[in-house]
Amino acid sequence: MESATTDIRDSIGSIPDYPKPGIIFRDITPLLQNPDAFRLTINTLKQRYAGQGITQIAAVEARGFIFGSALAYAMGCGVTLLRKPGKLPGKVTRQNYELEYGSDELQMHENALTENDRVLIVDDLLATGGTVVAASQLIKSSGADVVEAAFVVSLPELGGEDKLQQAGVACYTLCQF
């Protein structure tokens, strides 16, 4: 497993001074362009969650859609999209959350999940954790069970893992920067 996570980490790009000076952007594009690295990422996550009765992957907009859809296909379960406002037709359930400078909202279709669902939240990167705490609250409001939140990359210095722990959301990351 350690070898797999090292290979995955090595396939993630680092772009200095993007989107602004002093920031190092962790770019998943090289991982996605490398079929071996992408397959390894999905297979590593699949191994972790095999046999846990996951019925739905809750994929967080937008890059979570990539990993969440591939993982759901590999595991034989469904995908529930967690989107920004105005992106889903029909009736939606909403969860507001605070950002550093303002607020935002996640939405999902009103009847996307039931109390019988065991849900894995999937996103590409864990930074501050605010979006995933909101995702967990949104999922739980449907009566579904959140098994864990899974990420390809974590930036521990931004406190996301601590925030998730405080909110009672277990998390797993493949690699840290």
Swiss-Prot record:
Enumerate the catalysed reactions. AMP + diphosphate = 5-phospho-alpha-D-ribose 1-diphosphate + adenine
Q: Indicate where this protein resides in the cell.
A: Cytoplasm
One GO location term (cellular component): cytosol
Question: What UniProt keywords are attached to this protein's entry?
Answer: Cytoplasm, Glycosyltransferase, Purine salvage, Transferase
Identify the pathway: Purine metabolism; AMP biosynthesis via salvage pathway; AMP from adenine: step 1/1
Gene3D superfamilies reported in the protein's UniProt record: 3.40.50.2020
Q: Which InterPro entries match?
A: Ade_phspho_trans, Adenine_PRTase, PRibTrfase_dom, PRTase-like
A GO BP entry: purine ribonucleoside salvage
Q: Which GO terms describe its molecular function?
A: adenine phosphoribosyltransferase activity
The UniProt record lists the EC number as 2.4.2.7
Q: What does this protein do?
A: Catalyzes a salvage reaction resulting in the formation of AMP, that is energically less costly than de novo synthesis.
* NCBIfam families xref list: apt, PRK02304.1-3, PRK02304.1-5
Q: Which family, according to UniProt?
A: Belongs to the purine/pyrimidine phosphoribosyltransferase family.
Tell me the subunit arrangement.
Answer: Homodimer.
From the Swiss-Prot or TrEMBL record, give the protein name.
Adenine phosphoribosyltransferase
